[in-house]
Swiss-Prot record:
GO terms for cellular component: host cell cytoplasm; virion component. Residues 1-27 are annotated as: Disordered. Homotrimer when phosphorylated. This trimer is stabilized by binding to the L protein. Binds soluble protein N, and ribonucleocapsid. Non catalytic polymerase cofactor and regulatory protein that plays a role in viral transcription and replication. Stabilizes the RNA polymerase L to the N-RNA template and binds the soluble protein N, preventing it from encapsidating non-genomic RNA. It comes from the Viruses. The keyword Chaperone applies. This is Phosphoprotein. Keywords: Chaperone, Host cytoplasm, Phosphoprotein, Viral RNA replication, Virion. Residues 1-10 have a biased composition (Basic residues). Phosphorylated by host kinases.
């Protein structure tokens, strides 16, 4: 081999020996045995410095701490800070504490205001409902009392007006609010002819039956004890509502009426 350069005729620098590549992986592991193994994720978190707790964590921790209630917020805050060993606060720390206390007071005031407002609204609603119910009851009681008084009036005109008021029917009246005892008193005060008219109207319009054969029975009024007397008055007040509210009773009364007819001898008219 030529050991001199062509141009300068100076000797060439020595060529380093070429190292053969390592083909056995075991040899490589042996060479790296003295290096530290990489840490897994859990180990890295373990050796890392702990992170600072968040504000939520601190708040949750303080919620579990004992505190003396019944004192102003600043007194309770100072007592709690003294228990933690934070006696000397900087101006910035005091400002942060003041912001927290003020926000707590505002939240408490808002909650109290919302609760009080809801209580007032509910109370007003209940009072209005009770007042409306009492007004309706008094109005209907006054109407029944007026009708009762007119039925006992010596004036024929007054009695006729009372009967017209009973049989006319006021569809705007809520019969569920009427006093049953008051309606029964009205029935007792009515004359016999007026009662017969009320019964005939009830049988034909409410039970929807033909009472012609029934009237042929001697003492037919004695066989109507399955109909409460206040039903005649209530049906005259609001027949549409009566048919809806007392539909089951109407079905039972119609069946009872048919049983009475089937047990009595039929009379040819």
């Amino acid at each position: 081999m030529n050991r001199y350069s062509r141009r300068s005729r100076h000797p060439n620098p020595p060529v380093p020996n070429q190292e053969e590549p390592e083909r056995d992986p075991n040899h490589i592991d042996q060479d790296l045995a003295d290096l530290a193994q990489p840490l897994v994720l859990k180990e890295r978190h373990a050796v890392m410095a702990p992170t600072q707790p968040s504000l939520s964590d601190v708040i949750n921790e303080e919620r579990q701490a004992p505190i003396t209630f019944g004192n102003p917020p600043e007194v309770m805050a100072n007592a709690r800070l003294s228990a933690l060993g934070y006696d000397n606060l900087t101006e910035r720390e005091k400002r942060i504490l003041a912001v927290g206390v003020r926000c707590g007071e505002a939240a408490k005031d808002y909650h109290s205001l919302t609760t009080t407002k809801k209580w007032i609204e509910d109370e007003l609603k209940s009072q209005m409902v009770a007042l409306a119910s009492s007004t309706r009851t008094l109005t209907e009681a006054a109407s029944l009392h007026t009708t009762f008084a007119m039925l006992h009036s010596p004036s024929i005109k007054r009695k006729a007006e009372a009967m017209s008021h009973i049989s006319q029917g006021e569809e705007s009246i809520d019969i569920s609010k009427l006093n049953k005892t008051g309606m029964e008193d009205i029935w007792v005060a009515m004359e016999s002819e007026s009662k017969e008219d009320a019964v005939d109207t009830y049988l034909r319009n409410i039970l929807e039956v033909d009472p012609t054969q029934f009237y042929a029975i001697d003492g037919w009024g004695l066989y109507l004890d399955f109909i409460p007397t206040w039903h005649y008055i209530a049906a005259g007040k609001n027949s549409a509502q009566f048919k809806t509210s007392y539909a089951d009773e109407i079905v039972e009364q119609r069946a009872a009426f048919e049983r009475v007819l089937s047990k009595r001898p039929r009379v040819e008219i």
